Amino acid sequence: MFVKELEITLENGMKISGELDLPERQGQWKTIILFHGSGSSDRHATVESMGGIVSRNFDLLSEGFVKARYAVFRYDKRENYDIEIIIRDAREVTRFVSGLSEVEGILFYGWSEGVRVCTTLVSDFPNAQALILQSGIAEGWSSYFSYILRELTVEKLKELDNNNDSILEISDFLNCIPDSTSISFSLYLLILGTDKDGNMKFNEELDPEGKGRFSIIDNWIPLADEIVADPTTLIRFAENAPGETWAGILDDIKKIQLPILVLHGLNDGWISPVEAVQIAKAARNNADIILFKGLGHSLSKVSSPLKDEGGTIEDEVIVRVVEWLKKNVE
């Protein structure tokens, strides 16, 4: 692999650093641009948890694609949360890459939030040849939060309910340990807190009288329903909550007349595999879909959606993507 370090100057004068990974120093190549998931991310798609590195999956994707004789462009993400800025940066990055002498045509690879970025951008670039969409949201924030709050969190609460009476008590949560799953997002943002003495307590919206218990049916479900109906209401719990009632990508997908490969793990603990099916259906004859048993949001091995903390993408995924590319883009 030959690596060409590049710096992109944006219209506002700010700079983005990236690299073009090439099979050889000379020649023109079909070039896959990698678009990150949500939050802070670099050209490696580094995911960290508890002070350690969980994965750098863009390194593995790039290595696999370059071996298959594709070039890869990846970059250090500048903006963490404002989707309009993220898309604007991605558009300028794509325009820059399209003009490089080594680039014959471009392909989009989006992971999670990157799926939204890809489907928003692709119509601006007539030299785009294909899209690879991994673990993306089809129907917007409401479906995203419905899966996490109504399905996965309810499943976890029932698992924690020692009395099987749909009433959760503080003692049911004493063995919970924070991790990087969507369940921890629910537990530590929406359910659990501490009092002035540092003791565990429940959110006042679930336990307004401070009795140390709440009902799944009477307390949790109404809160979940409120957030699903209007995800912007999450702002009272998290400052980086969605500031929009985004309805998803299906309208954009229906307009795309390019080969599309949809990838999703059946044990994804953040985005329901149903979303992948919706994307593939919207693309009609343009799409192929691969659903991977036992893999999670990062297409790494995961035993359950409730335990999806991310991890190293499986080699099988890269092999399947390369096979699809050889068949549909060559």
Question: Predicted regions: what is each one?
Answer:
Residues 25-28, 32-64:
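Short, surface-exposed "cap/lid" segments of acyl-processing enzymes
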Residues 134-251:
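Accessory cap/linker subdomain of secreted extracellular hydrolases
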